[in-house]
Amino acid sequence: MSAKEEKVIRPIVHFPPSVWADQFLIFDDEQAEQANVEQVVNELREDVRKDIVSSLDVQAEHTNLLKLIDAIQRLGIAYYFEGEIEQALQHIYDTYGDDWKGRSPSLWFRIFRQQGFYVSCDIFKNYKEEDGSFKESLTNDVEGLLELYEATYLGVQGEGILDDALVFTRTCLDKLAKDLVHSNPTLSTHIQEALQQPLHKRLTRLEALRYIPTYEQLSSHNESLLKLAKLGFNLLQSLHRKELSEVSRWWKGLDIPNNLPYARDRMVECYFWALGVYFEPKYSRARIFLAKVISLATVLDDTYDAYGIYEELKIFTEAIQRWSITCIDTLPEYMKLLYKGVLNIYKEMEEIMGKEGKAHHLSYAKESMKEFIRSYMMEAKWANEGYVPTAEEHMSVAFVSSGYSMLATTCFVGMGDIVTDEAFEWALTKPPIVKASCAIARLMDDIHSQKEEKERIHVASSVESYMKQYDVTEEHVHKVFHKKIEDAWKDITRESPVCKDIPMPLMTRVINLARVMDVLYKHKDGFTNVGQELKDHIKSLLVHPIPI
């Protein structure tokens, strides 16, 4: 480093080191054993498939069929039965439309809404008395209360009956959880977990871990389904560990902790992030690419926020816009590794996709990365000038700098034939569902990261912008933002059935991005300061298999 560089005052911050070291670098392949397990899995899949198909034409079995589908989804094995589930739900929808005749209307409503069917909430009018209050009989049905509570999170703007039902069920369930602490601690815990995080916001693999032991305790459980859930979980965990080993070797080659020590070393957490977006085996290459992009996006974030000086950032931004290795000589020494790392992962994926005639898909991902970097540069400009943007100015840029519009486009790369050029173009236009996911990411991040970022030269957060513009307290802003976050979730539900030209598996990736935020940033910035909860999640998903 030159004497000139040494005099530069950098907005440096010391982030906690990685808690994982090289734990995931080595992967022990057990192919022979896995082949035997896969044979058993295929037999179990056929058993469950028959259960689904046999119930289709028997209307009296349709409620039980919905309960079976719900169990399959919560056990994390719906990817084994995508076609069968789609066929079953379409058949039931064609049979009843909005006029559901079976039991468990709350379950019917939730499953169809989360699958992208727009069914009416008028079915819940039967739950109310003439004076508008909810029927007293509902308070005695714990399972029914839980089902109704979970259904309310699939509401959209203007559905007042669901807003009322949420208040009603939360009040009842909160009381029940306290009353049952001693008499039925298992049920009390189950209720508390639901109140803490509704099903609609949970990550599938984490819900599978939580639900498998619960399902096993049900006297009515399907033995084939239970065994399939356990074996399937462990099989998939083995694939995920193999992928993480590959990403770990790539990260080790960059040696970020030594070469760029100012940046967060969160590669394992970034893989967890990508795993939250898609865990299914067929998305393996997409998941590996996304994990690498998120890992480097974290370093880019820290370069702009916590280390780079304004003139350096201008040069780096221009280099990313040009996207050419010939730009590398214009960069400061420490930025060269980062720039080369970014270009290399896109080039590598371009070569992989080129074998299928889809190399051009990377051009969409590059465009979203360029826009992402431009948003960082705008925030760096504001920070350099000491400018506090209005809340509206801030959000127009912060939606992009959250990284979620970039990730919403990038996560489609490598997903297979389901992704078309039109799907990428749709994502790049930032449709309402992408904007909603971005809003959730930005607002949750700002609520919990603001205090740490104030301690260094950093653009005013959306919290500070709102406080200054409207002359209100931080506590008031947090309430406003939490309401905006809930509204964004409603926008996601509203948009799922609207985007008919975009396949549901692609929409699900955008929704899953929002779900990851609800895990990582619900109570604090659990990504920067990795706590015990996230460590436990990662260990349970990537270290410890489920006992069979």
Swiss-Prot record:
Any idea what job this protein has? Sesquiterpene synthase involved in the biosynthesis of beta-caryophyllene, a sesquiterpene with anti-inflammatory and anti-carcinogenic activities.
Q: Where does Mg(2+) 1 bind?
A: 301, 305
Q: Which residues form a coiled coil?
A: none
| Binding site residues for Mg(2+) 2 | 301, 305
Query: Which note does the record give on the cofactor?
Result: Binds 3 Mg(2+) ions per subunit.
Assembly, in brief, is:
Monomer.
Give the family this protein belongs to, as stated in its UniProt record.
Belongs to the terpene synthase family.
Q: In which pathway does it act?
A: Secondary metabolite biosynthesis; terpenoid biosynthesis
If you read the UniProt record, what top EC class would you report for this enzyme, in one word? Answer: lyase
Q: Which GO terms describe its molecular function?
A: (-)-E-beta-caryophyllene synthase activity; magnesium ion binding
Q: What is this protein called?
A: E-beta-caryophyllene synthase
* Biological processes annotated in GO: diterpenoid biosynthetic process; sesquiterpene biosynthetic process
Tissue specificity, per the record, is: Higher levels in leaves than in flowers and stems.
Its required cofactor(s), as named, are:
Mg(2+)
The EC code for this enzyme is 4.2.3.57
Q: Where does Mg(2+) 3 bind?
A: 445, 449, 453
Query: What keywords tag this UniProt record?
Result: Lyase, Magnesium, Metal-binding
Domain comment from the record reads as follows:
The Asp-Asp-Xaa-Xaa-Asp/Glu (DDXXD/E) motif is important for the catalytic activity, presumably through binding to Mg(2+).
What the entry lists under PANTHER family is as follows: OS04G0344100 PROTEIN-RELATED, TERPENOID CYCLASES_PROTEIN PRENYLTRANSFERASE ALPHA-ALPHA TOROID-RELATED
Task: For the motif DDXXD motif, give the residue ranges.
Answer: 301-305
Catalytically driven reaction(s): (2E,6E)-farnesyl diphosphate = (-)-(E)-beta-caryophyllene + diphosphate
